[in-house]
């Protein structure tokens, strides 16, 4: 069995630590905690790291395309590594959830998220596991684009770091238990 954990974000230092890159932040934390390093795969346009957990190969991926083209990378890697969409988990930001709230889901629509729209369009299904991390709605008068491409303020960054710890625990639990249902029961709340 092989699994792939994908964090969504935009490449480049300009976007580091922005709200839209919270998926990258989560995968960075996982990779660091598991003492794995990323290597750049220019063919697939992604940073990829891997390890074995309970005799299962786990790939950790950060697409180096922009968010709206994440599906190209995900589809190519699923095909290359012969990974089923049932063994895909995507971590990404969610505007409609309070800052720092996390929610695991088995399937669902894109909910307006362009990275998820791209993945659904390229893999042909909405049925893949995901972890959504709340970044909150823009303040009055701020555009959605400026909000998602903005950085977290100090208080929100503290909240996000707590959320990233929870995501780290949830993903590790998921990889040990091999069950999204059990993980959802344990970590959704």
Swiss-Prot record:
Its EC number is 3.1.1.29. The keyword Cytoplasm applies. PROSITE patterns: PEPT_TRNA_HYDROL_1, PEPT_TRNA_HYDROL_2. TRNA binds at residues 15, 66, 68, 114. The active site is at 20 (proton acceptor). GO terms for biological process: protein quality control for misfolded or incompletely synthesized proteins; rescue of stalled ribosome. The record marks 93 as: Stabilizes the basic form of H active site to accept a proton. It is found in: Cytoplasm. The record marks 10 as: Discriminates between blocked and unblocked aminoacyl-tRNA. HAMAP family: Pept_tRNA_hydro_bact. Belongs to the PTH family. This is Peptidyl-tRNA hydrolase.
């Amino acid at each position: 069995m092989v699994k792939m954990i994908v964090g969504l974000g935009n490449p480049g230092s300009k976007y580091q630590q922005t709200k839209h890159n919270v998926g990258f932040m989560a995968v960075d934390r996982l990779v660091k905690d598991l003492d794995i390093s990323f290597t750049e795969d220019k063919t697939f346009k992604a940073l990829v790291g891997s390890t074995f957990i309970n005799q299962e190969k786990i790939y950790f991926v950060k697409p180096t395309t922009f968010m709206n083209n994440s599906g190209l990378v995900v589809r190519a890697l699923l095909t290359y590594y012969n990974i089923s969409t049932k063994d895909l988990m995507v971590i990404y930001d969610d505007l409609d959830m309070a800052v720092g709230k996390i929610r695991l889901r088995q399937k669902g629509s894109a909910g307006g998220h362009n990275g998820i729209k791209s993945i659904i369009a390229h893999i042909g299904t909405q049925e893949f596991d995901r972890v959504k991390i709340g970044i909150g709605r823009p303040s009055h008068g701020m555009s959605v684009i400026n909000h998602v491409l903005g950085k977290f303020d100090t208080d929100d960054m503290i909240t996000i770091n707590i959320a990233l710890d929870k995501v780290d625990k949830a993903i590790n639990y998921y990889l040990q238990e091999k069950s999204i249902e059990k993980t959802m029961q344990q970590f959704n709340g």
